[in-house]
Amino acid sequence: MSSIYKALAGKSKDNKSEKKQGNVKQFMNKQRTLLISSRGVNYRHRHLIQDLSGLLPHSRKEPKLDTKKDLQQLNEIAELYNCNNVLFFEARKHQDLYLWLSKPPNGPTIKFYIQNLHTMDELNFTGNCLKGSRPVLSFDQRFESSPHYQLIKELLVHNFGVPPNARKSKPFIDHVMSFSIVDDKIWVRTYEISHSTKNKEEYEDGEEDISLVEIGPRFVMTVILILEGSFGGPKIYENKQYVSPNVVRAQIKQQAAEEAKSRAEAAVERKIKRRENVLAADPLSNDALFK
């Protein structure tokens, strides 16, 4: 009996050791993104945030932030909801949209200016993807050309890359998010991975034609600056070629004012020229002789 007991006890110890070895914690990519906007967003900005919320199942959408000055509150909100990424959309003058990409609590933070914005409702593309599916992130080769682009790529991966087994995500990969650099601007596009076959035999043999069909939304981001901390800290990069939309609008208004001024001056010159070119009265004309 003692030998049987020892054999069974040895087996139980072996099973416990195997369970302990099997219960070793594996690395899990726990990324959660906070989607939040400021006051003053218009309907197009709101539709863009809604589209991104549908494409990012690991995100949490929150109501608008009341302040635009004290952005440090976003770190507390992210900590409250266990989010380690923040996408903050800041609206100015009901027409300009800025995107703050941050990694709380230690940073860094990247500020973008968004232009050429088109939502899914505007585009009406034929592409579609499963809600909650994970994307394939495609980056341009120029993201490896400079250190600040490498940092931007890393933050884009953390914010737009849906980790496996994420909240509300489905185990499918059926769309691609493309980030390309053209004219020092980041162009964002979303495509569906479409599979098509001519007949059942090709489908069974795995001979499928794979193509990309655009879904939307599409927009262009211009880098403004990069901060070392999360919504604060020293400035580690600044885009010297960035021109504020306020400056652009002021230049357009100034050009229109100069054109209006030149038109008014030309009209005055025409009136003066007409007065100067009036013919003098002929003393031998019928009007002068037969009054």
Curated annotation (Swiss-Prot):
Which PANTHER family does this UniProt record tie to the protein?
RIBOSOME BIOGENESIS PROTEIN BRIX, RIBOSOME BIOGENESIS PROTEIN BRX1 HOMOLOG
Q: Which family does it belong to?
A: Belongs to the BRX1 family.
- Give the function comment from the record: Required for biogenesis of the 60S ribosomal subunit.
Describe the location of the Brix domain by residue ranges: 31-232
Q: What is its main location?
A: nucleus
> Which UniProt keyword terms apply here?
Nucleus, Phosphoprotein, Ribosome biogenesis
Alphabetized Pfam families for the sequence: Brix
Q: What is this protein called?
A: Ribosome biogenesis protein BRX1
A cellular component term from Gene Ontology for this protein is: nucleolus
Q: Specify whether Phosphoprotein is a keyword of the entry.
A: yes
Subcellular location, in the record's words? Nucleus, Nucleolus
InterPro entries of this UniProt entry?
A: Brix, BRX1
Instruction: Determine if Membrane is one of this entry's keywords.
Output: no
Query: Its gene?
Result: BRX1
User: Would you kindly state one Gene Ontology biological process term found in this protein's UniProt entry?
Assistant: exonucleolytic trimming to generate mature 5'-end of 5.8S rRNA from tricistronic rRNA transcript (SSU-rRNA, 5.8S rRNA, LSU-rRNA)
Quote the record's miscellaneous comment: Present with 13200 molecules/cell in log phase SD medium.
Say which domain of life the source belongs to: Eukaryota
Q: Which GO terms describe its molecular function?
A: 5S rRNA binding; RNA binding; rRNA primary transcript binding
Q: According to the UniProt record, list the residues that bear Phosphoserine.
A: S285
How does this polypeptide assemble, per the annotation?
Part of a complex that includes BRX1, RPF1, RPF2 and SSF1 or SSF2.
